[in-house]
Amino acid sequence: MTSNTEKSLQILKEEIQRLEEQGISGHILEELMEFRRENDTGDAAEERCIRPQIPFFGKEVLEMAIAALLAGENVLLCGGKATGKNILAENLAWLFRRPTYNISFHVNTDSSTLIGTDTFRNNEVQLREGPIIQCAKTGGFGILDEINMAKNDAVSVLHATLDYRRAIDVPGYERVVLHPATRFIGTMNYGYAGTKELNEALVSRFVVINMPSPDEETLNQIGRASCRER
C-alpha cells in the first residue's frame, strides 16, 4: 500500500469519525460513501479536490445539506456574516470528494463571466469555457459565492442549469449536459450593501438552508479542531 493511499484512508477515517461524533445519521453516512464510490473524481480534476482548513460543526445543518445534495438538489445557504456559509460549502465539496469551483458574484457578473466567451484560436472562433461549464463537465461542486450580489438578469442564464434540465445551452455551440455528480451551492448574505433580493424563479431551484449563528460550544469545537490540524 502506498503512503498516499494510507494517508487518504487515514483522512477518510478522521472525517467519518468527526461526523459520527456530531451524531450524523448512519444512513446518511452510508449514502455519502456510496456516492463517493460511484463517482470517481479522476486524475484530471483531483487537484481541485481541496481539503478545507477548518471543519464545519453543526449536526442539523450538515444533515440537511448532505441529504439534499445526495437527492440531487442544489443548496442555497443564507445567513449573516460569520455564520460559516463558505466553510460549510467547502466542507461539503470535500466530503463528497468533488472538484471545487469557487465563483464570486458581484454587480458586474454577466453570462460571459459564468458560461464563457468567444475567443479566436487556430483561425476559428471557439468558446473559452467559464467556470459553470467546467464544473458541469467534471462533476464538480460549484460554490456560487454571494449570488445575490449579481443582477437577476445575469443569473437567469443559470435557470436551465439548476433545474430538472441540468443542461447549458450556449448559442452557436453544442449543448452541455451536466455530469451526474455536479451540484451547485449558493451563499448569500441578507441586507448588506450591494445585495439584491433573488427572484422566486431562481430560489425555487435550490433547497434553502438558513444558517444559525455559531454558539460558544461550536466555536470551541472549531478551535480544538484547528489546533489538531496544525
Stretches with model-predicted labels:
Residues 2-228:
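AAA+ P-loop NTPase catalytic core and its hallmark functional loops
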